[in-house]
Amino acid sequence: MSQFTLLGFIALGGAFGACSRYLISELCVVLLGRGFPYGTLTVNVIGSLLMGILMSSLNQGLIEAGPWRPIIGLGFLGALTTFSTFSMDNVILMQHGEFIKAGLNILLNVALSITACFIGYQLMMKS
């Protein structure tokens, strides 16, 4: 596959990831409200779980590396997850004096995302 074609597939993965992020974030607002950045937390945890599954699958030889790692890992998951929005969510919470919520958001994003990535990786390990 040419580099130009690969870039096109990465961009397509990014488009699907960005649309998925938007839809998941909007669903979280509908279901859980705007009192906490649930959407950002949700996409970061889901993305981490999927990254663990992807990397374990690649390392185990369950899927061929080929273009899938950059298409899914960089394109789709790169657009689905978000560190900049996570950072801004915390700045806004702190500006409003919501330091406990900001701390909880930081703790949950880091702990749950790493745990989800570990679980996803372990799920794909060969027995």
UniProtKB/Swiss-Prot annotation:
Q: Name one Pfam family in it.
A: CRCB
Q: List keywords of the entry alphabetically.
A: Cell inner membrane, Cell membrane, Ion channel, Ion transport, Membrane, Metal-binding, Sodium, Transmembrane, Transmembrane helix, Transport
Tell me where the transmembrane regions lie.
Answer: 4-24, 35-55, 71-91, 99-119
- Topological type in the membrane: Multi-pass membrane protein
HAMAP family per the UniProt record, alphabetical: FluC
Q: Which PANTHER family match?
A: FLUORIDE EXPORT PROTEIN 1-RELATED
Spell out the protein name for this chain: Fluoride-specific ion channel FluC
Q: Which organism is it from?
A: Photobacterium profundum (strain SS9)
Q: Which gene encodes it?
A: fluC
